[in-house]
Structures are given as structure tokens and as C-alpha cells.
Regions:
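Conserved histidines in hydrophobic membrane contexts and catalytic metal-binding motifs
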Residues: 1-74, 147
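Short hydrophobic alpha-helix segments
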Residues: 3-6, 96, 190
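Hydrophobic alpha-helical scaffolding
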Residues: 5, 40, 82, 126-129, ...
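Glycine-centered flexibility sites
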Residues: 25-28, 49, 79, 83, ...
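N-terminal beta1-alpha1-beta2 submodule of the flavodoxin-like/Rossmannoid cofactor-binding fold
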Residues: 55-125, 130-137, 141-145
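FMN-binding flavodoxin-like domain, especially the glycine-rich phosphate-binding loop
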Residues: 99, 116-118, 122-225
Length: 225
């Protein structure tokens, strides 16, 4: 019952061993399984998150430029945080092109002078507590800076959710900004759409088609079943 040798390990040694076993699951099968499942889950969320982000970015890039700033009679300006509103813009631009008209889709932050423009269609969502989306946060200042040389007929559509108290608040801001401008003529009153409702969007199309200020008449968007 004699002790022939004795070694004392510092606290850092035990800490290192504890973290090593915790991260590797050494000596504990259940812990190893939990760590494996956790690692796979983290990898899954990283990959899917990257794919969603990339898809949203490419969606914005692919449909942004259809014609040039200098020759487009129709300008579709979009405010969107996640890119969903661009789908409605793309739907309208395709039909405008089918009539042989030149059209361009741009984010609201790219607002500038459009020498040939006659019609603006503005589609914008609202971010947070009534704030503009990230691609529209400079629109108000740019609108005040650039004066269009022609008379512009315009229509504004706001996208939002009635579950938020400030439903389509930024679209209201844009409407209040543009309406008093002398050379801008409102085609339709501000349209507010809840949760990207295609039914409500088609209601706007019906009103657009009935207006005497519109030359192009749109087909309704199909509801996917």
C-alpha cells in the first residue's frame, strides 16, 4: 500500500481533457451521436441558407436590366428586401415587351433621370416598422434630386402584411412624396396588397386596364394550384 510516484496535473489539463471529450464524444456513445446529428444539422442550415441567399440575389440581378435608361418609355421601380417583389415586376415587364415597348426594371435606389420615360410603375414592400427596404433607402433623397424632363403617368403598389401595424407604410411614404409633384399624374390610387396576394394584384390589373391613361392592357397573373 505504498505510493511509489505521484504526479499533479494543472487545472488546465483537466479543462483541456473535458473540452476534448465534449467535442469528440470520446467514451460516450450517446454524446457522439448527438454531436454527429448537430454537426450535420449545422451543415444543412449553412448550405440551405446560402442557396436561399444566392437565389434571392440572382433573382434581382437577372431581371434588373431589360433596356437602357435612355430609351425606356416604361420604368418599373422596385423596393424589395428579399427579392419577392421583383417577380411581379418581371411579370409586368414581359407583357410590356410583348407590345413592342421598351421597359426597364430598376431598384428604387437607382432612381435617376429617364429621358424617354412616360410611365412609372412602382412596386415596393415595407421593412420593419415602416422603413424602406435596403434597396430603396435612398429613394426619397434621389427623387428630390432628379427632376424628370417629361410628364409621367404613374401607379404605386405596396406589398406588406396586415399582421403588422404599419401595413405598406413605405408605399404610403412614396405616394405622399410623388403625388404633389407637378409633372407626375396618378393613373390609379395607391394599391396595398396583403401577403403578395395574386388575387389583389389581379384586382390592380383590372383597374389598370380600365384606366384611360393606360395604353398597354395586362393579362391577369395565374394563381398556382
Amino acid at each position: 500500500n505504498r505510493i511509489y510516484s505521484q504526479s499533479f496535473y494543472p487545472f488546465s489539463y483537466f479543462t483541456k481533457e473535458w473540452f476534448y471529450n465534449l467535442h469528440t464524444g470520446k467514451g460516450n456513445m450517446l454524446l457522439s451521436i448527438i454531436l454527429l446529428v448537430s454537426s450535420i444539422s449545422i451543415l444543412f442550415f449553412i448550405i440551405t441558407g446560402f442557396k436561399i441567399s444566392l437565389k434571392s440575389t440572382l433573382k434581382n440581378i437577372k431581371i434588373k436590366y431589360l433596356s437602357s435608361d435612355k430609351e425606356s418609355k416604361y420604368v418599373i421601380l422596385v423596393g424589395s428586401e428579399k427579392g419577392n417583389t421583383f417577380e411581379f415586376a418581371k411579370f409586368l415587364s414581359t407583357q410590356i415587351q410583348s407590345f413592342g415597348e421598351r421597359v426597364i426594371i430598376k431598384p428604387l435606389n437607382s432612381y435617376k433621370i429617364y429621358n424617354q420615360a412616360e410611365t412609372f410603375i412602382i412596386l415596393t414592400s415595407t421593412y420593419g416598422e415602416g422603413d424602406p427596404p435596403s434597396n430603396a433607402n435612398n429613394f426619397v433623397s434621389r427623387f428630390k434630386k432628379f427632376n424628370q424632363p417629361n410628364k409621367i403617368n404613374y401607379s404605386i403598389i405596396g406589398f406588406g402584411s396586415l399582421s403588422y401595424p404599419k401595413f405598406c407604410a413605405f408605399a404610403v411614404t412614396v405616394d405622399n412624396l410623388i403625388r404633389p409633384t407637378d409633372n407626375f399624374k396618378e393613373i390609379l390610387p395607391l394599391m396595398k396588397i396583403n401577403r403578395s396576394s395574386i388575387i389583389e394584384f389581379n384586382r390592380w390589373i383590372g383597374m389598370w386596364n380600365s384606366s384611360e391613361l393606360t395604353k398597354i392592357k395586362f393579362n391577369e397573373m395565374k394563381i398556382e394550384t
